Amino acid sequence: MANSVFWAIAVALVLGAEAYMPLDYRCGVKPKSRDNCGPPGISPDECVKKGCCFDDSDPDSIWCYTPWKFEDTICNPAEPKARVNCGYPGITSQDCDKKGCCFNDTIPNVVWCYQPIIEAVERDCSAVEPKKRVNCGPPGVSPDECIKNGCCFNSDVGGVPWCFKPEIKKELLQCAVLPKARINCGYPDITMDQCYKKGCCYDSSESDSIWCFYPDIEDVTIIE
């Protein structure tokens, strides 16, 4: 969630309130779901240079962690009432598409230009039991070399590979999260831009709800 990460932003206007979703929220990983991407004490700059995300707002979580890897965007017109607006009144399909959003005007009385679901791939190191680790590097491989090759590194357990293959999960992420189900990703008075830089979703259409929140994992499929 560092400032040097570039973002593609999808902008929407809902009844005069701000409601936005960053299409590239690769660092929007919930604290409890993070996989370590650097050694203890790594600086924000060093973390980002490694292609990782850095966020130290939660003292009990991993600060330098592996980002989401995006595969595709998905438009799902099967749930029209759950659509999250991504345009303005009268927006054309061409302008909607340029924003990285979905357009479907076949159903009346619902949003036509709406935010897509993001298909991402997650490398989950914590899901691999030590006895089930599959070696992913040569003897003596360094933590940096191991991680750079897309593998996991953990030297806490003896007699098992320290550099090993992660569990690969395909997940669907979205910002269409009900207010009561949102997990806070910000702090009081956080701005829209500050929220985006943290890789999170922003929706200020309801004054008494969390405005800056983590994208929701809709579906998980283990592919490797």
UniProtKB/Swiss-Prot annotation:
User: For this UniProt entry, what's an example GO CC term?
Assistant: extracellular space
**PTM notes:** Glycosylated.
GO terms in the biological process aspect are: maintenance of gastrointestinal epithelium
* InterPro entries reported in the protein's UniProt record: P_trefoil_chordata, P_trefoil_CS, P_trefoil_dom, P_trefoil_dom_sf
> Which UniProt key words apply to this protein?
Disulfide bond, Glycoprotein, Growth factor, Repeat, Secreted, Signal
Pfam families per the UniProt record, alphabetical: Trefoil
In this protein, the residues bearing a glycan are N104
Which PROSITE patterns does the entry mention?
A: P_TREFOIL_1, P_TREFOIL_2
Recorded hits in SMART domains, A to Z, give: PD
Q: What region holds the P-type domain?
A: 25-68, 73-117, 123-167, 173-216
What this protein is called in its record is Putative gastrointestinal growth factor xP4
Cysteine pairings via disulfide bonds = C27-C53, C37-C52, C47-C64, C75-C102, C86-C101, C96-C113, C125-C152, C136-C151, C146-C163, C175-C201, C185-C200, C195-C212
Xref: CDD domains:
Trefoil
Domain of life where this protein originates: Eukaryota
Q: In which tissues is it expressed?
A: Stomach mucosa.
User: Predominant location of this chain?
Assistant: secreted
Where is this chain's protein located in or outside the cell?
Answer: Secreted
Q: Which GO terms describe its molecular function?
A: growth factor activity
Which stretch is the leader sequence?
1-17
Listed Gene3D superfamilies: Spasmolytic Protein, domain 1 (4.10.110.10)
Q: What does this protein do?
A: May act as a growth factor.
Has UniProt tagged this entry with the keyword DNA-binding? no
